[in-house]
Amino acid sequence: MAKLTKKMKSIKAAVDSTKAYEINEAIAVLKQFATAKFVESVDVAVNLGIDPRKSDQNVRGATVLPHGTGRSVRVAVFTQGANAEAAKEAGADLVGMEDLAELVKKGEMNFDVVIASPDAMRVVGQLGQILGPRGLMPNPKVGTVTPNVADAVKNAKSGQVRYRNDKNGIIHTTIGKVNFSEEQLKENLQALLAALAKAKPTTSKGVFIKKVSLSTTMGAGVAIDQASL
């Protein structure tokens, strides 16, 4: 831990916390200090002009990033009949109904995303206490409860990110890996911010996207000058 602490101190010392960096400069800084032995993720924190205490101002949704996230996603689908075949053809890793529910109850959850057709919610609903705390419970607001499970599987596999503000009104998600090109990361960030802008609650007044910061898995946060986007 001492080495990590020393490294973090040096990174924070090199990043001007009072400055909003132009996007390409920010990405260059992130790449410079991404020296972990694995390919670090590039994460984003977006401070929104909302009151998270008000339910009608909470922001939640999903969008497909043009260049994906750089990570392989395992998808489980609760459905049956023709939809089950369509889900398999679309690339789902696990497809089932009661049999899949039994695996979940046993703690066998080797998947990152859960999708369900509406008729399967009678089964999935019984798994709320298991899936909910893990952020895996299907929800129509993010497109994971849908009659078109094949498209949902394709979206999940092609780099869809889900977002939801925390209690401080901040969205945290990933926009790729540090080995992505500057242009790929920039375009992914632009796609996310465009999706957030469309999701602005009608009751939210004033500046909606107040601050955007990027960081890598092991790095410090870098504030972004939104004018450079």
From Swiss-Prot:
NCBIfam families documented for this protein: rplA_bact (TIGR01169)
Stored InterPro entries: Ribosom_uL1_bac-type (IPR005878), Ribosomal_uL1 (IPR002143), Ribosomal_uL1-like (IPR023674), Ribosomal_uL1/biogenesis (IPR028364), Ribosomal_uL1_3-a/b-sand (IPR016095), Ribosomal_uL1_CS (IPR023673)
Quaternary assembly: Part of the 50S ribosomal subunit.
Family: Belongs to the universal ribosomal protein uL1 family.
The encoding gene: rplA
CDD domains: Ribosomal_L1
Name of the protein in its database record: Large ribosomal subunit protein uL1
GO cellular component, one term: cytosolic large ribosomal subunit
Organism: Pasteurella multocida (strain Pm70)
Gene Ontology BP annotations: regulation of translation; translation
MF terms in GO: rRNA binding; structural constituent of ribosome; tRNA binding
Taxonomy, superkingdom: Bacteria
PANTHER family: 54S RIBOSOMAL PROTEIN L1, MITOCHONDRIAL (PTHR36427), LARGE RIBOSOMAL SUBUNIT PROTEIN UL1M (PTHR36427:SF3)
Keywords (A to Z) from UniProt: Repressor, Ribonucleoprotein, Ribosomal protein, RNA-binding, rRNA-binding, Translation regulation, tRNA-binding
PROSITE patterns: RIBOSOMAL_L1
Gene3D superfamilies (UniProt xref): 3.30.190.20, 3.40.50.790
